[in-house]
């Protein structure tokens, strides 16, 4: 009797579809990919169950075309977690399972990492060959000598030896002095542990000691003020996990936090580290995914989708900035990476640490009801002190493109004292939208009805909701007037005002638009961390987790935008953003100051932030 197999395929299907087992092939197992027919198409799906019961007559079922994997890509626990997630978040099961895979696996490519050419010294090579080559082919002699010393050469090492090194090596291969072979290349970053561990203070030591990899499941909230050394707590726990041969999964909310965390982990850990986020190529993401699955990576740092990466020897999960809304997938298969991380840690029976300076209200409620262990780091590490916070009353104040005279005065004062200034506005673009001064027409997206953001540099209107773009109209579509004006403030508009007011001061703007090119964010952050840019302007990309030791003033340009939003979480998120961005000030020896512009200085939320933190 032919076996019936349930396969989850991408599409609007609440449950897996029934297929007959492939002929002349071993029976595919749950977690394997298969190629199946669906209508006139052929799709990549994933086997969910092999002992399936079906009410459909077998002659009406189609057969699986072929099995794409020799072993399950996803283990039973992770498969069950993704299926549970699809049901919980009311999403088609096939879409959820397939979206959990790297793009190349979704497309049906082999589950193998990239190949790297390795050059090795041939057994026939002799020292006398080297002497002969020095006279006739000095370049080949240099490479042969290198091989005699190190035995092997990788492509990365070869790239540092000059443009003609590969051609010279090929000649050595032709002469029988060297051989080549292909090896798997996972793209791992090696930690060199060049920096000694910091001595933990009492609060850090208590928090770190509570995280026990290899000793069962526990949920711990590491509730530490900005600059309190939460990362040191993570590093202590990760080091102990590595010593036990266990892997650690670290989830971060933003791509921008990955380079800084990776650099710090490399300096402190003697480990193989993989990174997974959307800024990598498809091949790089597949390599990282496979490295974690094969146990080649000791630590995996990733954004929210990394929660679905299989782990060969799981020991610890860390969710940094657990409160952050970026941990929630907002389109396609919608899910909360933090909540799924907690569930996955429970299924794997490993501890999970949730870190934040501004925990979400639901996490605080769980901690106070003792569902989570609550560990507080209430003081900044080292000699750093909490910044002085003040409100700048905007009522009746003349402004220059949203910048009040008191804020401009504080910026100038800190620049004169050789300080670094960070100005925060959580709205990219030149202005939120365009308005007609004659009739009040507003630029709305014709696809989704959201307001279209005005980008002056590109001379375009861009919908940040559905990604639609269009040219700026020459006249009002409603009344024909040519008096179209930008309405409200965006980072591009503030940048223009700052360049006019502080023309001789190096300025860096960091938002999603200015960091689209690969590596641009890292370059801009390095300039900021070295103090080369004295004025920093940015959105929430700058507010989270970055160590900027020379920032002495943080200015919040528009606190009011979060006070009266329709979202019931708007006040909570405003408080979190202000506290997070305020934490960038005064992180080293010099004291910090935070200036918050508002038309509502008496608002209870702002008063609580200023006086109660």
Language-model features: where?
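Inter-lobe coupling/hinge segments of SF2-like helicase ATPases
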Residues: 195-201, 205, 209, 216-613
């Amino acid at each position: 009797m032919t076996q019936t197999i349930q396969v989850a395929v991408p599409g609007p299907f609440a449950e897996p579809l029934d297929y007959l087992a492939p002929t002349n092939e071993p029976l595919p197992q749950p977690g394997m990919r298969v190629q199946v027919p669906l209508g006139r198409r052929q799709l990549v799906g994933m086997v969910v169950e092999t002992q399936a019961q079906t009410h459909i007559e077998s002659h009406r079922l189609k057969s699986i075309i072929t099995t794409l994997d020799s072993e399950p890509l996803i283990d039973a626990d992770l498969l069950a977690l993704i299926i549970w997630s699809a049901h919980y978040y009311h999403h088609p099961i096939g879409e959820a399972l397939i979206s959990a895979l790297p793009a190349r696996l979704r497309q049906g490519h082999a589950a193998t990492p990239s190949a790297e050419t390795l050059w090795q010294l041939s057994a026939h090579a002799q020292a006398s060959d080297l002497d002969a080559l020095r006279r006739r082919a000095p370049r080949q002699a240099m490479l042969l000598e290198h091989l005699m010393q190190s035995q092997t050469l990788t492509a990365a090492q070869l790239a540092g030896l000059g443009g003609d090194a590969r051609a010279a090596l090929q000649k050595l291969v032709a002469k029988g002095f060297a051989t080549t072979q292909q090896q798997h290349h996972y793209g791992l970053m090696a930690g060199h542990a060049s920096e000694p561990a910091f001595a933990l203070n009492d609060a850090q030591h208590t928090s770190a000691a509570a995280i026990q990899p290899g000793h069962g499941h526990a949920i711990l909230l590491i509730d530490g003020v900005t600059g309190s050394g939460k990362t040191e707590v993570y590093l202590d726990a990760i080091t102990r996990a590595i010593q036990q041969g266990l892997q650690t999964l670290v989830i971060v909310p933003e791509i921008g936090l990955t380079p800084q965390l990776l650099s710090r982990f490399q300096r402190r850990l003697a480990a193989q580290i993989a990174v997974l986020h959307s800024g990598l190529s498809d091949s790089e993401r597949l390599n990282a995914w496979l490295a974690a699955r094969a146990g080649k990576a000791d630590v995996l740092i990733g954004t929210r989708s990394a929660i679905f990466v299989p782990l060969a020897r799981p020991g610890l999960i860390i969710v940094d900035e657990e409160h952050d809304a970026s941990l929630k997938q907002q389109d396609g298969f919608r899910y909360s990476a933090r909540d799924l991380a907690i569930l996955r840690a429970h299924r794997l029976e490993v501890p999970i640490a949730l870190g934040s300076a501004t925990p979400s209200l639901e996490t605080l409620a769980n901690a106070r009801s003792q569902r989570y262990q609550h560990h507080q780091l209430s003081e900044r590490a080292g000699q750093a002190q909490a910044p002085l916070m003040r409100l700048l009353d905007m009522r009746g104040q003349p402004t220059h493109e949203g910048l009040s005279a008191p804020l401009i005065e504080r910026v100038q004062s800190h620049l004169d004292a050789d300080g670094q200034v960070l100005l925060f506005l959580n709205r990219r673009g030149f202005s939120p939208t365009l308005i007609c001064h004659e009739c009040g027409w507003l630029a709305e997206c014709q696809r989704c009805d959201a307001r279209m953001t005005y980008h002056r540099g590109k001379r375009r209107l861009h919908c940040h909701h559905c990604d639609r773009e269009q040219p700026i109209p020459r006249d009002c579509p409603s009344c024909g007037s040519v008096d179209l004006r930008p309405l409200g403030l965006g980072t591009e508009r503030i940048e223009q005002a700052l360049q006019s007011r502080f023309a001789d001061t190096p300025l860096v703007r960091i938002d999603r638009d200015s960091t689209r090119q690969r590596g641009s964010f890292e370059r801009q952050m390095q300039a900021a961390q070295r103090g080369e840019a004295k004025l920093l302007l940015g959105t929430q990309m700058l507010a989270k987790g970055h160590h900027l030791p020379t920032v002495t003033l943080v200015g919040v340009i528009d606190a009011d935008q979060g006070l009266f939003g329709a979202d019931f979480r708007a006040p909570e998120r405003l408080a979190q953003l202000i506290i997070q961005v305020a934490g960038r000030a005064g992180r080293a020896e010099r004291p910090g100051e935070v200036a918050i512009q508002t038309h509502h200085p008496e608002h209870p939320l702002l008063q609580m932030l200023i006086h109660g933190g």
